Amino acid sequence: PLNFGVAEEEAKERARKALKLVGLPEDLLKKSPFDLSGGQMRRVAIAGVLAMKPEVLVLDEPTAGLDPRGRREIMDMFYQLHKKEGISIVLVTHSMEDVSQYADKIIVMHRGTIYKEGTPREIFSSPKELVELGLDVPETIRFQLKLEEKLGREIGKPSLSLEELVSNLHLLKTGETGYDG
């Protein structure tokens, strides 16, 4: 913020607020970058951007290289920034787990052009089509497709979460389809 003419005291206040937004303690400002974990370094970098008060964050593979816990924490943080602070987030990722759980809208690119766009439910409603194109689908859907192949029948609508898959399996057991229509 100082480079954009923000007064020093306001810049410090923005930095403190940004650290809080990304879930880091204020005393981290006194630490050497070499003492931070990979996840903390990413959060500090994001806090630096948030101190600028952006309306939109454009993120390219922000969870690459993080362990599952770190990935979930970072994605939860982006989700909260969107919901509580009203920041629009454009996420470029190959992680279908992340988009199925966190995205409001997905744009699928294939060979440099927009192939499909919609909600996670709409995009993953025809997973076999995506797989045939060589695109990935969430792990729960991959598991569901393998299970359906073994059973020789559909379980229900594609499951975007483990909870949905369990619900679809329960519906199958009770003789229902899991489809709304």
Q: What is the role of each PLM region?
A:
Residues 10-27:
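Conserved ABC ATPase "signature" region
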Residues 117-118:
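ABC ATPase "signature
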Residues 32-36, 40:
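Conserved ABC ATPase signature
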Residues 57-60:
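Catalytic Walker B motif of ABC-type/P-loop ATPase nucleotide-binding domains
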Residues 53:
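Conserved catalytic motifs of ABC-family nucleotide-binding domains
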